[in-house]
Amino acid sequence: MLGKDYMLAIILVNCDDDLWGDQNLEGETGLPPGWRKIRDAAGTYYWHVPSGSTQWQRPTWELPGAEDPGRGTEGIWELRPPKGRSFSSLDSSLNRSNSLTWYSEDSYVRSLEPGAKCFAVRSLGWVEVPEEDLAPGKSSIAVNNCIQQLAQTRNRSQPHDGTWGEGQNMLMILKKDAMSLLNPLDHSLIHCQPLVHIRVWGVGSSKGRDRDFAFVAGDKDSCMLKCHVFHCDVPAKAIASALQGLCAQILSERVGVSGEAACCSPDPISPEDLPRQVELLDAVSQAAQKYEALYMGILPVTKAMGMDVLNEAIGTLTARGDRKTWVPAMLSVSDSLMTAHAIQAEAGAEEEPLWQCPVRLVTFIGVGRDPHTFGLIADLGCQSFQCAAFWCEPHAGGLSEAVQAACMVQYQKCLVASAARGKAWGAQARARLRLKRTSSMDSPGGPLPPPLLKGGAGGAGAAPRKRGVFSFLDAFRLKPSLLHMS
C-alpha cells in the first residue's frame, strides 16, 4: 500500500460500485437447472451455481444414451459439460479474473434479510497471533504476514487439523451483528462470528493479494487469538467495506438506543455499552505511543479534507528546504493529544513543543506519495485549516495507524458524551416538570474549550462539537468505506 495515495484513516476509499446488486445475474429460460447467465465487464458467460464452475459456451441439454426409449424424453434430461472442461469446485471461479458478485441460488439470495451481504470465499486456515502484535503500528503488519503465510500454501496439499472450514469453499454472509460462514451447497452453518468480537481485519496489501481477506478474533475453546484468512471471489476490499459499514451501523444504533433510553433510566452510559469495533483502540487510550520522526513543518491549506490537498502541502514542505533543516522530533500520540518535542542533545533539557494538536481537531490524515511522509490537517476555527507533515523511517505506516486509532477513540468518546448529555437533559426536564417551572431549560452541554494548536498561526475561539474529528468520521458513520491495511 505504501507508495500509493492511500489514506490510512477511516475514509480511505469510498466504494461507489454496486458490488452486491444482482442485476448482473440473469435467470434465462431454456438453461439447464442450476445455471445462470452472467453479464459483466468481461463479457457474457455462464455460471453453474452448485459447483461454482463457469464457461463461455452456453450449456446444453443432452439425452442420456442408456435411457429406455419407451420412457420417452420427458424428465430424463442429462447435463453434460463441454468437452475439455469438467465441473470443478469453487477453485476455478476463485482464481479467474472475473468476479462474481453472488455465489448462491437466486431464491436463497432473495431470502436474505435487507442489508445482508453475501460473498464466495475459500478458507485458507488460521494462524495464531500474539496479543502484543495487535498494538497500533503492528496489527496491520501482523495481519498481512498471516495472509502471505497462508496464501503461499494455498495450492499445496497439506493435512487439515480439523479446524472449522479449513480448505473449504464457503459463503460469507455479513448481516446485522454477525459474520456467518455457510456451506455453499446446502447452506448449513459452519461458523458464526459476532462482529463485536473481531479484534481487527484487513486486506492483503502485497501484489496479487488484493483478494485475500483476514480477521483476528479470540477462540473461546483454545483461549488464543487466531487470524483467519480467506481467498475471495471479489476484491477483498468489498468485504472490508461491508464490515466497516455494519460496525458503524452497530455503533450508531447502540448510541441512539442509549440516548433514547436516557429519559427513562438514571444510570449513566459507559463506553462498555458500545460495540468494540476494533479492540486495538483500547491500547491507544492506555498510554501514549511515541515515534521518532523528522518534523517538516506546517502549512496553511484551503480545505479540511482531500488527499490532493494533503499531497500538495507535503510536496510544498518537502521542496521548501534541505532535509537537514527538518527537526528530529519525538512524536507522542495519545487518544486526546499529539505533541512533537525536539530530541535534545543534552539530557534534561526542556523546551516548548515544536508542534501540538488535540486529536479532536484532526479532519484528515494520510500517507503522501513518498511512503516516508505522513501528514494531517487540523481545523483551527473560522474556516482556517493547517497541515503538519513528518518524515518517518522506515515508513509512515506505524505513525498513521496510531493517529487513526486515536481518532477512533476520540470519536467513541464524542458519541458517549453526546448520549450522556442527552440523558442529563432528560433528567433536568423531568425535574423541572415536577417543580412546575415555566422558565426555559438551558442545554447542559457547554462549549468545547478553545483549540490548543501550537506550532503555527491559527484562529482562536470555541470550536463547535461537530468540527474536527467528529466531522472527520461522519463518512465512517453514514456510508461504507475501506480501511486498507498494509
From Swiss-Prot:
Subcellular localization, as worded in the UniProt entry: Cytoplasm; Nucleus
Q: Please indicate if the UniProt record lists Chloroplast as a keyword.
A: no
Biological process GO annotation list? negative regulation of apoptotic process; positive regulation of protein secretion
Annotated segments matching region Disordered? 438-460
Any single GO molecular-function term of the entry would be: low-density lipoprotein particle receptor binding
Span of domain WW: 29-61
Question: Which residues does the UniProt record annotate as the domain PID?
Answer: 113-280, 285-440
Which keywords label this protein? Cytoplasm, Nucleus, Repeat
Tell me how this protein assembles: Interacts with APP (via intracellular domain). Interacts with APLP1 and APLP2 (via intracellular domain).
Q: Which PANTHER family match?
A: AMYLOID BETA A4 PRECURSOR PROTEIN-BINDING FAMILY B, AMYLOID-BETA A4 PRECURSOR PROTEIN-BINDING FAMILY B MEMBER 3
Q: What does this protein do?
A: May modulate the internalization of amyloid-beta precursor protein.
- The molecule here is called Amyloid-beta A4 precursor protein-binding family B member 3
What organism is this sequence from?
Mus musculus
**What is the gene called?**
Apbb3
